[in-house]
Structures are given as C-alpha cells and as structure tokens.
Amino acid sequence: MTIAFYAGSFDPITNGHLDVLRGSLLLADKVVVAIGVQAQKQSLFSFEERVDLITQVGRDLLNVGPDRLQVISFNNLLIDTAREIGASFLVRGLRDGTDFDYEMQMAGMNGIMAPELQTVFLPASISGRVITSTLVHQIAAMGGDVTHFVPQNVAQALRLKFKF
C-alpha cells in the first residue's frame, strides 16, 4: 500500500490544501495528514477542531473515509513521523517560486536524513495560489467572506470563532 504523508499546521484547512489532498489521493492508496503541534505556537483552532474539519472535508468533499484519509499529530521531525507510519513519500504543495525555493531546501535536508523518502511536489490550482491560512484568518477576523478560500465547513467554523 502506498502512503502519502502530508504535513502542515492546517489552521485552518484551505482550498489550497484541498487541491493537494485531491492530488495526493490520486497518487497513493492512503493519505496521512499530519498536523504539526507546537506548544509555543498559538493556533486559532485546537488540534481536535482541525482533525474534525479535515475529516469532514475528506468525507463530504473528497468522498473518502478513514481507510483512505487519516489525520494524526506530530511534534518531532517530520521524517521521523513519516517513517513511523510507513510513508511511501512526502507531499508538499507549491503556490509560487517562494514556496518552491523553501520546499526544495526542505526536501534536500529531508533527503539527506531520510533518503528512502522522496518529496512529491503538487502545484496549487490557479485559484489556490493566493490562499494562505494567515490571510484567511485576517479576512475572517474582520468579518469578511472567506467562502472562496476555504471549504464550507471551515467557513462556518470561522464564523463561529469570530462570532459574525
């Protein structure tokens, strides 16, 4: 069984992340979404809320269940967790040249430490290239419409978070 390992903060999951998940599901039998949990980093959504949002997206928009999409946490080196779960490859999304430069450096470092794990880059769709979780936070915090940038369940969760 091929297992794609897709790590990030997913705070919250965006349509750009959804693009990468769709592509990953085409390449692997199973995708493990690994949410990085760092005590010193303040998150808008709790780990449990992010798991629920991603699981709902998998079920409702991607039509996949826990046999194809699993959500876990990690707080160590990404490659260590990828090895622990038996990942076949790492998945990273690319929006622009800045992402490419950063992700190539990370892939190089990961490749030295874990040569058995290749990194597969998936380009964002044209509409997904402008989306960042940070911008989504800012728009939602000011009561703006984020429905173009996040799945419907996430837009609803943001409305509840920011009470608008």
From Swiss-Prot:
<feature type="binding site">
    <location>
        <position position="78"/>
    </location>
    <ligand>
        <name>substrate</name>
    </ligand>
</feature>
<keyword id="KW-0548">Nucleotidyltransferase</keyword>
<comment type="similarity">
    <text>Belongs to the bacterial CoaD family.</text>
</comment>
<feature type="binding site">
    <location>
        <begin position="128"/>
        <end position="134"/>
    </location>
    <ligand>
        <name>ATP</name>
    </ligand>
</feature>
<keyword id="KW-0963">Cytoplasm</keyword>
<dbReference type="InterPro" id="IPR001980">
    <property type="entry name" value="PPAT"/>
</dbReference>
<feature type="binding site">
    <location>
        <position position="92"/>
    </location>
    <ligand>
        <name>substrate</name>
    </ligand>
</feature>
<protein>
    <recommendedName>
        <fullName>Phosphopantetheine adenylyltransferase</fullName>
        <ecNumber>2.7.7.3</ecNumber>
    </recommendedName>
</protein>
<dbReference type="InterPro" id="IPR004821">
    <property type="entry name" value="Cyt_trans-like"/>
</dbReference>
<keyword id="KW-0460">Magnesium</keyword>
<feature type="binding site">
    <location>
        <begin position="9"/>
        <end position="10"/>
    </location>
    <ligand>
        <name>ATP</name>
    </ligand>
</feature>
<dbReference type="GO" id="GO:0005737">
    <property type="term" value="C:cytoplasm"/>
</dbReference>
<comment type="function">
    <text>Reversibly transfers an adenylyl group from ATP to 4'-phosphopantetheine, yielding dephospho-CoA (dPCoA) and pyrophosphate.</text>
</comment>
<dbReference type="GO" id="GO:0005524">
    <property type="term" value="F:ATP binding"/>
</dbReference>
<feature type="binding site">
    <location>
        <position position="103"/>
    </location>
    <ligand>
        <name>ATP</name>
    </ligand>
</feature>
<dbReference type="GO" id="GO:0004595">
    <property type="term" value="F:pantetheine-phosphate adenylyltransferase activity"/>
</dbReference>
<comment type="subunit">
    <text>Homohexamer.</text>
</comment>
<feature type="binding site">
    <location>
        <position position="9"/>
    </location>
    <ligand>
        <name>substrate</name>
    </ligand>
</feature>
<feature type="site" description="Transition state stabilizer">
    <location>
        <position position="17"/>
    </location>
</feature>
<feature type="binding site">
    <location>
        <begin position="93"/>
        <end position="95"/>
    </location>
    <ligand>
        <name>ATP</name>
    </ligand>
</feature>
<comment type="pathway">
    <text>Cofactor biosynthesis; coenzyme A biosynthesis; CoA from (R)-pantothenate: step 4/5.</text>
</comment>
<keyword id="KW-0547">Nucleotide-binding</keyword>
<dbReference type="InterPro" id="IPR014729">
    <property type="entry name" value="Rossmann-like_a/b/a_fold"/>
</dbReference>
<dbReference type="GO" id="GO:0015937">
    <property type="term" value="P:coenzyme A biosynthetic process"/>
</dbReference>
<feature type="binding site">
    <location>
        <position position="41"/>
    </location>
    <ligand>
        <name>substrate</name>
    </ligand>
</feature>
<keyword id="KW-0808">Transferase</keyword>
<dbReference type="Pfam" id="PF01467">
    <property type="entry name" value="CTP_transf_like"/>
</dbReference>
<keyword id="KW-0067">ATP-binding</keyword>
<keyword id="KW-0173">Coenzyme A biosynthesis</keyword>
<feature type="binding site">
    <location>
        <position position="17"/>
    </location>
    <ligand>
        <name>ATP</name>
    </ligand>
</feature>
